[in-house]
């Protein structure tokens, strides 16, 4: 089963992935962008180089294609539980050039069965981002991230409607433990 965690930076995805690693010890944990060696290089270029938005979108699509082919598909074949920090949903939300059609091509129509969507309010997002160093995307500001968050939600529910992906929407302001229990229950109801 392919499960993804989605949310803007600061929503608590990394915290939840850490907690899930303790609970699902046999799961394959991965991330987008950067879930492969090639992906790490593409991610570094996309986030740190001064390139056009179109070029950045294609770098992320290339990363996604390689990630699906070399990580996700083999793990699905082995019937592993796969938990990914981000997916095509982020690709579509963060870039105006990353359409569903391009992402379906990059993923060979391999989609997550379950989507965990962590949503955060403006005040908590400001507070959490003030505690970390920001990359090029995060430096675009709180309002931009809140717009991206709305797009994450829109794309997650569009995948649910078009392809039957299950969505669990959570308030990221809740305690990490409370969120973890809800996420684990959502994953375990099939595992």
From Swiss-Prot:
Determine the domain of life of the protein's source: Bacteria
Family annotation (Gene3D superfamilies)? P-loop containing nucleotide triphosphate hydrolases
Q: Which keywords appear in this protein's UniProt record, sorted alphabetically?
A: ATP-binding, Kinase, Nucleotide biosynthesis, Nucleotide-binding, Transferase
Q: Which reaction does it catalyse?
A: dTMP + ATP = dTDP + ADP
EC assignment: the record states: 2.7.4.9
Q: Which GO terms describe its biological process?
A: dTDP biosynthetic process; dTTP biosynthetic process; dUDP biosynthetic process
List, alphabetically, the PANTHER family matched.
Answer: THYMIDYLATE KINASE (PTHR10344), UMP-CMP KINASE 2, MITOCHONDRIAL (PTHR10344:SF4)
- Name of the molecule in the record: Thymidylate kinase
């Amino acid at each position: 089963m392919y499960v993804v965690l989605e949310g803007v930076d600061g929503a608590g995805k990394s915290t939840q992935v850490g907690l899930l690693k303790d609970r699902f010890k046999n799961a394959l944990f991965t991330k987008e962008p950067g879930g492969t060696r090639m992906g790490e290089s593409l991610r570094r270029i996309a986030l740190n180089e001064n390139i056009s938005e179109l070029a950045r979108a294609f770098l992320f699509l290339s990363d996604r294609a390689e990630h699906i082919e070399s990580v996700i598909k083999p793990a699905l074949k082995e019937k592993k539980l796969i938990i990914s920090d981000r997916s095509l949903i982020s690709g579509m939300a963060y870039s105006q050039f990353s359409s569903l059609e391009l992402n379906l091509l990059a993923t060979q129509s391999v989609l997550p069965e379950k989507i965990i969507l962590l949503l955060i309010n403006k005040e908590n997002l400001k507070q959490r981002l003030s505690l970390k160093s920001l990359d090029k995307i995060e430096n675009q500001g709180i309002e931009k991230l809140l717009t991206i968050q709305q797009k994450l939600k829109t794309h997650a529910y569009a995948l649910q409607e078009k392809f039957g992906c299950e969505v669990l929407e959570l308030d990221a302001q809740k305690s990490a433990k409370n969120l973890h229990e809800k996420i684990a229950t959502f994953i375990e109801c099939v595992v």
